Amino acid sequence: MIDVMQIQEILPHRYPFLLVDKITELKVKEVVRGYKNISISDHVFMGHFPGHPIYPGVLILEGMAQTGGVLAFESMEDKVDPKSKVVYFTGIDGAKFRNPVRPGDRLDYEMSVVKNRGNMWIFKGQAFVDGNLVAEAELKAMIVDK
């Protein structure tokens, strides 16, 4: 498992834009699973939507992207310092939002490698709440020098 303090050593994101709390499983160049606890105190709920809080789909995608970024960094064969590199997401295809995500939910991410060639990655991303699919997409990324 990789906790939030270790995630911050891998990814440049910080509160309020670090959208993965823990990595629960990681198989190099294959799959990563992690989650974010969705809280009513998340700043996004001040405006999305008052009286009917729904976690934005674009933030679900970003959380999947960050989870995939951890997998990409941990799968690098040359093990460079992540502080000298950054993962840029270059494309999102086939994004679908199946069910709303609300405060109190645990948002589980699963990112599977579809293809990897050098610094280029294609992931199949899925997000779940209580085992139910809430979002899915194919995400493309590349690791570049800062």
Swiss-Prot record:
Involved in unsaturated fatty acids biosynthesis. Catalyzes the dehydration of short chain beta-hydroxyacyl-ACPs and long chain saturated and unsaturated beta-hydroxyacyl-ACPs. Its EC number is 4.2.1.59. SUPFAM superfamilies: Thioesterase/thiol ester dehydrase-isomerase. It is found in: Cytoplasm. The active site is at H48. This is 3-hydroxyacyl-[acyl-carrier-protein] dehydratase FabZ. HAMAP family: FabZ (MF_00406). GO terms for biological process: fatty acid biosynthetic process; lipid A biosynthetic process. GO terms for molecular function: (3R)-hydroxyacyl-[acyl-carrier-protein] dehydratase activity. It catalyses: a (3R)-hydroxyacyl-[ACP] = a (2E)-enoyl-[ACP] + H2O. It comes from Campylobacter jejuni subsp. doylei (strain ATCC BAA-1458 / RM4099 / 269.97). The keyword Protein biosynthesis does not apply. GO terms for cellular component: cytoplasm; membrane.
